[in-house]
Amino acid sequence: MTSSGSLVAGAVLPENYARHANYHVKTIQAYEPHGLHVNYVSLNNEPTCCPSINYPSILLITSSQMATMLKDDWFPAFKANHLTTKILLLDFNWGNADLVEPL
């Protein structure tokens, strides 16, 4: 699913954007029967944390890739499944503004 072929590092490949969105849909739905509502999810998982200890992470993709992923895959998947969960962007490593490509 990622460019590294691993849970560690690597970015989600464009051909897997829909699969990635559906993974999050299914995860969110799995919590609901237990009375747990997921309010927020994030596109990235600590992309600059701990590569030396094989910490699962998803690397940054460009802002334009994020926009495409959201527009074409995440928003439609959430809407089709009537999810009200919000999607966070760039919610990690706030001190590293250089990691962000302006839209």
Predicted regions mapped to residue ranges:
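Substrate-binding cleft and catalytic face of glycoside hydrolase catalytic domains
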Residues: M1-P102
